[in-house]
């Protein structure tokens, strides 16, 4: 049971750091990103959910916390495919 607790702490910690990096280091989250997300989503309910979700930075950080290690794993696999 303690192993599960360690895993969840690591999962959420890596997700938090990835979200902070996405917003403050990469500076991807700006008006252009919001417009792109608005264009990429379909009309109707999906567009409303996307605009609601990406309305502020805390929602984006929470999203990255929940997906945890997935962005890190995707970046590592992309590096291996390139090299």
UniProtKB/Swiss-Prot annotation:
It is found in: Cell membrane. It is a multi-pass membrane protein. Keywords: Cell membrane, Membrane, Transmembrane, Transmembrane helix. One of its GO terms (cellular component) is plasma membrane. The keyword Transcription regulation does not apply. Disulfide bonds: none annotated. The chain crosses the membrane at residues 5-25, 60-80. The keyword Membrane applies. This is SPbeta prophage-derived uncharacterized protein YopE. It comes from Bacillus subtilis (strain 168).
């Amino acid at each position: 049971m303690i192993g599960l607790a360690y895993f969840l702490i690591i999962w959420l910690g890596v997700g938090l750091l990835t979200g902070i990096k996405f917003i403050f280091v990469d500076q991807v989250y700006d008006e252009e990103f919001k417009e792109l997300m608005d264009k990429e989503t379909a009309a109707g309910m999906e567009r409303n959910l996307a605009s609601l979700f990406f309305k502020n930075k805390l929602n984006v950080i929470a999203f990255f916390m929940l997906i945890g290690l997935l962005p890190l794993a995707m970046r590592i696999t992309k590096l291996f495919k390139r090299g």
